[in-house]
């Protein structure tokens, strides 16, 4: 928790978001059906957690391979968070975002404390869940005839995000090289369960 507080303070000190950037995000917010807003609320919460997973990793790990991996993927997850946030009203976002930040930080920091392979096992578990999560939403949108331009734009965002998450999963699997042992498998099962619970909560709160 102390690492989390220090990292949070550093991020606040270095924040450089501009008013122009914020105006662009507001300009892109569109009117969407309630069910799609619910899906996007879970996506926004999930991408928030993903950003903080990498912050958690970077706050602990000194392994150069892990740090390069985390820094590169953090940039991608920040872009995902912005893109999804650009089509979801602030008032429709999960009210539990502080919880998702802390949960994400812990999910990244714990495996980084144990070892580099655990980081990659964790990312594989997270991205496997996210791949399936996005796929369901994309299929639902694909099933709608005469999709309006706003919803088509959302589908394009989800497809791009999903492609990135699949690439993250495959890269983590490749770098890990060895199959996880029993304890690592139990940890990954816990991460997957936590992801399912988070989606259910974010959809409602």
Model-predicted segments: where are they?
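Non-heme di-metal
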Residues: 1-205
């Amino acid at each position: 928790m102390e690492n989390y507080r220090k990292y949070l303070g550093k991020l606040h000190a270095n924040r450089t978001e501009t008013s122009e950037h914020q105006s662009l995000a507001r300009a892109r917010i569109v009117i969407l059906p309630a069910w799609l807003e619910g899906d996007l609320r879970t996506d926004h919460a999930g991408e928030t957690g993903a950003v903080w997973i990498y912050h958690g990793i970077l706050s602990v790990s000194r392994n150069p391979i892990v740090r390069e991996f985390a820094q590169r993927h953090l940039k991608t997850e920040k872009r995902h968070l912005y893109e999804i946030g650009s089509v979801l009203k602030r008032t429709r976002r999960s009210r539990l975002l502080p919880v998702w930040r802390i949960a994400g930080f812990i999910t990244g920091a714990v495996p980084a404390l144990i070892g580099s392979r655990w980081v990659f096992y964790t990312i594989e578990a997270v991205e496997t869940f996210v791949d399936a999560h996005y796929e369901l939403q994309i299929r639902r949108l694909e099933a709608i005839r005469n999709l309006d331009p706003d919803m088509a734009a959302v589908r394009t965002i989800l497809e791009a995000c999903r492609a990135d998450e699949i690439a993250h999963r495959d890269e983590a699997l490749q770098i890990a090289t060895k199959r996880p042992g029993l304890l690592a498998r139990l940890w990954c099962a816990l991460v997957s369960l936590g992801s399912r619970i988070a989606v259910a909560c974010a959809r409602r709160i």
